[in-house]
Amino acid sequence: MKLIIANRRYSSWSLRGWLAAKQSCLAFEAELVDIYAPDWPVRRSSGVFAQANGKVPILIDGESVIWNALAIIDWLDRKSGGTRFWPAAGPARAFATSAAAEMQAGFLALRQACPMNCMRHYPGYAIAAEALPDIARVDELWSTGLARFGGPWLTGAAFTAADA
């Protein structure tokens, strides 16, 4: 399998795909693309990138092309036996499914106000007021999962899609 990603330091979507691939314990090769390169606008509109709407991460598994971090997590879960990224059943599975979907689709104000850079520290960074409800919701979501299922991961003892 090949996982095509941008730099994990700056791309939370690429980081999610890479974390899932690592946690799956399946063999994969990571290919880094420079989304800031001058030729990226042309590259992203052709080949496998066009199929993925010009976005990363992209997982290539034989003739199958999977894009979107949550779709990649689901694909890897099925390839690794169907129990790697989702709790078996019940409340933990319901929480993991809902939390992963919310984190995938939500928090737009937070994403716009706080671009990701894992290699920098920004003392005194003023967070936009529009992002504060998203930050409160992330805190609530994570606190709820840890308290309800006992940690150390969001739904208990094992890493799941919600943690990616």
Regions found by a protein language model. Give the residues of each.
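GST-like fold's C-terminal all-alpha helical module
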Residues: 107-164
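GST-like domain detector, emphasizing the conserved glutathione-binding G-site
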Residues: 1-127
